[in-house]
Amino acid sequence: PECHMLYNVTTMATTWHTVAVHDIRLLKKQLDIVNSLPKEYTFLNYLRCHDDIGWGLDYDTLKQWQMEEIPHKQYLNDYFTGNYSGSESRGELYNDDPVTKDARFCGTTASMCGIESAGFEQDEEKMKKAIRKDLMLHAYMFMQAGIPMIYSGDEIGQVNDYTYKEDEEKKADSRYIHRGTFKWDLAQNRNDQDTVEGQIFQTLSYMERIRAQEEILGPDAEVTAWDTGDQEVLGIIRKYNGKSLTGLFNFNNCKKQLTLPEEGIYR
């Protein structure tokens, strides 16, 4: 191939689409495509990065499920900016076109998961849900085939930085909302499980250790997306050297119960 490491932007955008619609069908289809490619293609997987999110989704498929491109992009932007009823996400638009109604989105992982709004409202229950969503998405990323990348600040749940608006050279570019300097003062809390930073940092560190230690999470494992029978729960199965690892990821805020059609001893 031209490039041996590929930036997995489509999966990233499709992941956030899934967060907003609570429907994993498009994400499963995207993962099926990625997992069917030859092993020499290695993907760099991420939830957020330095750039904006452009909603480059498979609209031909979405149209079959009554999701038209223009109104769906508007919905996603309304949802993640917090302008849709029930959304706890926060962020800003970039390159907003008033004629075509098209726009791209900017925000950190933590703010998109609701950590910013929960902190502002000082709502403990909302914060617990937001942290669970943040960690679930990272666990899902660690299960994917490829190389997981954690963007600076995500390891401590860093939220949007609005101070860019005070800088004359930056205030016109909303992408700086997720390009803020690393909050070293907040990083001091990383070992305190009673803080947001501590809960996220300690759990991500645990995930990293498992990813590094377990061969089944390595590059030679067979990775497939599993049809769980529930459109709100994504299943990912890894198989290597006679062992199998199943990951279940609930893209709804409610508890779910599933039956695994497998035999054997589980741990």
Write out the residue ranges for each language-model feature.
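Active-site and adjacent substrate-binding regions of carbohydrate-active enzymes
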Residues: 1-267
